[in-house]
């Protein structure tokens, strides 16, 4: 249990320390949210907050990978999740900087979901009225759909 607490604290500290660096880089590269009538902020706001979170996750993985309990968690599936998160962060950075069109973003999101499927990560059952076990092909479609919905819900916020 102590290793998981250490992992949490390392990740939180790294994110706290990395955020100002990423913010400065976002401003430097022009990845800022312009002021609009519907927004609350009154000055341009730096984007790329996900980059700081991703960087803290990556550094935390590198630091705690050798701990006896936590290190055992980094298998094939964790590599897939890390690769997919890297791809979505890069897509988000490009979108924040260059305002990508909707079709390009959708293609990138489907690509990210495909990475998860390649690494064997998919929804196998749904807890609806008991448990519904899904055939692999339906599970893959549901996985892609849920990944797309979650990415766009987070991006909407």
Regions found by a protein language model. Give the residues of each.
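"…together with the soluble PPM/PP2C metallo-phosphatase catalytic core" -> "…together
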Residues: 1-157
């Amino acid at each position: 249990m102590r290793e998981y607490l250490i992992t949490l604290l390392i990740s939180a500290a790294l994110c706290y320390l990395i955020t100002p660096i990423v913010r400065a880089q976002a401003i430097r590269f022009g990845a800022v949210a312009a002021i609009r009538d519907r927004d609350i902020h009154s000055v341009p706001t730096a984007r790329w907050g996900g980059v700081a979170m991703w960087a803290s996750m990556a550094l935390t993985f590198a630091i705690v990978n050798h701990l006896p309990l936590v290190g055992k968690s980094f298998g094939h599936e964790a590599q897939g999740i890390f690769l997919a998160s890297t791809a979505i962060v890069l897509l988000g950075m490009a979108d924040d900087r260059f305002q990508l069109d909707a079709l390009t973003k959708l293609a990138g999101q489907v690509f990210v979901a495909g990475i998860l499927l390649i690494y064997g990560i998919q929804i196998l059952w749904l807890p609806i009225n008991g448990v519904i076990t899904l055939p692999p092909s339906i599970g893959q479609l549901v996985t892609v759909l849920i990944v797309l919905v979650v990415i766009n819900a987070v991006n909407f916020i």
